[in-house]
Amino acid sequence: ELSVKTTGKAMVPILNALGYDLYLPGNWEVIYYKKAMQTLLGSLNAPKVCANMYHDLGDGKKGELIFPPYYIWNIKGVKIGFLGYTDPLVPLRQSPEYSRGIIYKGPEENLAYYVDVLRNQEQCAYVLIVSHLGLSQQLHLANREECKGVDYILGGDTHERVRKPIQCKYSKVVEPGAFGSFVGKLSLTIQNGKVISDNYELVELDADKLKADDEISALIKENEIPFEADINSIVGYSTIPLYRYFVVENPIDTMVLNALKWKVPEVDIVLSNGFRFCPPRATPDHTGNIPITDGYLYDMLPVDSTLRTGTVTGAQIKEWLEKELNNVFAK
C-alpha cells in the first residue's frame, strides 16, 4: 500500500538504507511506467545493470540500452563481472502499457558478446549473470552455448528455493526464495588472482533469531505514518491461513478469484495476475479468525488495477494458456 500510494517513492530511502551493492530492474519495476522507473531507479545509490532493455525509438526501432549492461567489482585486484538480464516477456505477460517506450530482447542476442568483453577485454576472473528471467528460462539459458564463460546465474522472478546449485551445461543456476525469507550466499575462494573454488548456500532469515535494525525500522515507521490508519484497518476475516507458496494454486489466489466471481457473477471465467509473492497471514485475533487488513490487500494485489470484463473465444483462451505454460514451465 505504501508503494502504491506514493508511486514507489517511499521505497527509495528504505532501499538506500539497506545498502544494496547492485540492482537489476525486474518485471514490476515498470509498474509506474518508464519515466517513473528511470526516476526511482536513478534515486537508488547503487549501480544498475540490464543488458536487454532498450529505448524504443518508435516503429519498433531499438535505441540505446536504458541501463549499463554490466558492472565490475574489483576485489584486491581480482575482477568479478556482473551481467544483468530481465524478463524479455514483460510486454506479453503484463499490460504492454506498463512498459511502453521500452524494447526487450532475449539474452541470447548479446550474451556471448558481453561475456567476451568481460572475460577477454576486462579480464574478469569470474562472471555472473544477475537475472530476473524465472527458473525455467534461466536453466534454458545456462544450457545454451552463448552462456559459455558464465560461472553462475543468480536468478529471480519465480522465487524458487534452490538449496543446491543446479549445474547446467555451461553455468550453475540458483534462486533464493521469496519475500526476504532467505538470502543466497555465494562464497568465492581466490588464490593468486584466480577463483579456485565456490560455495553456495541458502541462508534462512529467521525473524525470531535476527533482531530488526533499529534505524531501518524507524525509517519504515516514519514513511508509514501518513497511511498507518489505512494500512492497519481490518476489512475482513479468513477462517483459513492465507499464503502463496505453491506454483499453480494457492489459498490467496483462490480467495481473490472467488471475490472477483462474487463481484461479477455473470461472467464464465475470472482471471487474476499470478503474483508469486506475498507474506503469509495465519495468526488469528480475539475473534478466532485471521484478520485481513487494507494493507494486506495491497500485499496480495500490489497493483491498483481496474476490474475489466470482456468477450473471448475458447481458441483464444487455449492459445493464451498454452503460451503461459510454455513460458513458465518449458522454456
What are these model-predicted stretches?
Residues 1-207, 247, 251-259, 270:
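Acidic, metal/ion-coordinating pockets
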Residues 1, 119, 152, 187-331:
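Solvent-exposed loop/linker segments at secondary-structure transitions
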